[in-house]
Amino acid sequence: MESIFLHTNITIIPHSVLYVSLSYYIINPCTSASSNFDDSFS
């Protein structure tokens, strides 16, 4: 039972890290671009 739980953790954790890093790289340029856009019009 524990080996199954350990195996799911090993497979799930890298996927969640990959998803978080991907979403960060997608969202971060958008937010920085929008803040620069707001600054130029203020």
UniProtKB/Swiss-Prot annotation:
It is found in: Membrane. Keywords: Membrane, Transmembrane, Transmembrane helix. The chain crosses the membrane at residues 5-27. It is a single-pass membrane protein. GO terms for cellular component: membrane. This is Putative uncharacterized membrane protein YMR046W-A.
